[in-house]
Amino acid sequence: MVHHMSIFDNQTIESLRQQIRTIPNFPIEGIMFRDITPLLNSGKYLNKVTDMFVTICNHNNWVPDAIVGPEARGFIFGPLLAAKLGIGFIPIRKP
C-alpha cells in the first residue's frame, strides 16, 4: 500500500475535508455517507483534488495507458484525471 497523505500538507487536506459533508445513517442505519457535492460545486476544490491525483501518479512514477472509472464517483473524477494526464478514460458500469 502506498501512503499518499505525507506528500500533501495538513492545511490542504483539511480544506478538502471541510468540503465533504457526513450524513449519518444514510442510506441505512449505521452508514456514514460522505457527500462530495460541496466539493463538486467548487471549481477551486475540484481542480485541487484532481491535481492531487496527478501528484500521486507522478510521485509514484505511475504512467497509466488509460484511467478506468467505476460508475458513480469514478465517472466524475476519472475523466478529469485522464484529461490532465493526456490519456483516455474507460467508464465501467455496474451490472
Question: What annotation goes with each model-predicted range?
Answer:
Residues M1-P95:
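PRPP-associated nucleotide enzymes
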